[in-house]
Amino acid sequence: MFCEQFGLSTAADSTDRGQIRIGKRNVEGGPRQSDITHEAYRVVVGMRGDINDAWSYDAYGQYGTSNLSAVATNDFSIERTARALNVQIDDRVDDDGNPLNPTTFGTPQCVSVVDGTDPACVPYNPFALNGIAADQIGYLQIPLVLKGETTERIVNASVTGDLTNYGIKLPSASTGLMLNFGVEYREELSELLPDGPSQAGDGAGTGGPTTPVNGGYRTNDIFAAARMALLEDKPFAQSLSWEAGYRYSDYSLDFTTDTYKLGLEWTPIEDIRARASYQRSVRVPNVTELFGVQAVGLDGTIDLCASDVSDGETVALTPEECARTGVLPEQYNNIQSNPAAQYNGFVGGNPDLQPETADTLSFGLAFQPSFAPGLRLQIDYFDISIDDAIQNPNADFSLLLCAQTGDPLLCSRIQRDGDGSLWQSNDGFIVDTFQNIGEIATKGIDLDVSYAFDIGAAGRLGLDLVATRLESLEFTPQPGVTYDCAGLYGSICGVPAPEWRHKMDATWRTPWSGIDLTLSWRYFDAVKQDSQDANEFLSFLGTASGQDATDAELGSRSYIDLTGSVTLADKYTLRVGVNNLFDKDPPLNGANACPSGPCNGNTWPQVYDAIGRQIFGLVTIDF
């Protein structure tokens, strides 16, 4: 029965052959662990002063470096496991017929021991009833070591002038034109050095090779900014001013960029200030996005043309749609899905990347009422649009859109192995290197409220709320396909994007000089799995990939933090605290909604506290 469901005959004279893949998780060797250390250093040397009554200068040099050291343990070596599974009876004898090794003669031994290629090999029987022995673990497990360094060097010089003294001002204002202009040199270098086993992808739980990175770039900038009052001390215009700025950057990557801003600020009365601004900004690709070595590793979460063949499951797409993704007629309904929802991608850097550009429109209002001393409120609306966004195309997206549209560019990214699989060998993958693709647009509101007041002999209490209301987070990876990820997470939307998040602090400035206590509440609104959204593209992909309502929503999360600080002699500050005081676990979700990379350990450490309660200490010395 087992053979027949794969189309294999069990007749005595049958010559049918088939492949079987057996997987086993290494539970006996203990959980995989990582010991990660970051060390950062920064040195700034500068000088500033007055040139005359109207002009001043500011110049500085900065050097910063961040070092990474990571050691992963309890990973099985793929190479050693293969040797340990390749076993034969030791039947070696000398010319007289005597055993070459009486101790091992007649016992199971690794072929690599017998032929001398690896004398240290220990046979491994994954089906043994009594588990795995210590000597087997000692041979099979290897440490994986990663070293890295990022370095930044900056030299900046600028002059600032108040041209009011030269009479360059409007008759309607007493403050004249303010100017700032200067030059800057910046150098960014990054190096990542995995050890040999890491580069070879020899760790069984790593999902593929960790490739080295070595690269950098330099930029020479010139910049200028101006600010000028239009009205001052007028009815309903205590002040009205404009500002503008421009920066030209010449990169060693053979491109240049222009960024600029325009702004208007109006203070009708002392208690209220309104502002509006437009900015053109750029983000250049970082060193990893540019120079990361390209290799096959875990990336996507689905293959819509694969299914659980052993259970007779049928695929989600039609034969015609699967053919567009490279499936041969005889492979249709015969491609085994990955039980861990992990598929191969060809990932890495792209030296041909160009900067992404963003246009930001913002409006803000600040309210600091004189009738309520200590109260301050700021609210800002933002509308950001990004073109030529630097992203991975998203393997799941490429597969679905290729199947639906037959787009030649999308379909060319899909490379199946000889059996049609995208995971059973490194010959099957979806190209997912960094590209300048599509558009991203987001809108929302930032809120900042604070209120500080005396509490008599007990000192002073300060309340602060910083919150963001996310109205939309739209992605347009190609014309005609747009989806909004606000309030969603999953295999397409990726990292959870709560529609509301905030941090609220209550700070008690005690009557004992220099001693403060702060209690903080961090909150993240619930998010839905993207497959549950009404968007046709997202819902179809979720249904086709087997996502269900099991983890349709990650519930809201609250974290409480406590921090205390003591300042001595106005220069020494000791700060200690506990983050996630009540050791709240992060929300978990299944593999189908957990893309490799941003989703780690079935949760999202970019948003939620993944390692529980954390205790920290910090010493600051001012001199």
Where in this protein do the model-derived segments appear?
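Surface-exposed, low-complexity loop segments enriched in small/polar and acidic residues
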Residues: 1-220, 279-355, 380-446, 479-494, ...
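Short loop/turn motifs that connect adjacent beta-strands in outer-membrane beta-barrel proteins
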Residues: 50-57, 164-177, 231-240, 271, ...
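Transmembrane beta-strands of outer-membrane beta-barrel proteins
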Residues: 57-59, 177-183, 238-244, 260, ...
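Transmembrane beta-strands of outer-membrane beta-barrel pores
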Residues: 61-67, 163, 183-191, 230, ...
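Solvent-exposed loop/turn segments connecting transmembrane beta-strands
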Residues: 216, 249-258, 449
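C-terminal beta-barrel architecture of Gram-negative outer-membrane proteins
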Residues: 297, 459-567, 582
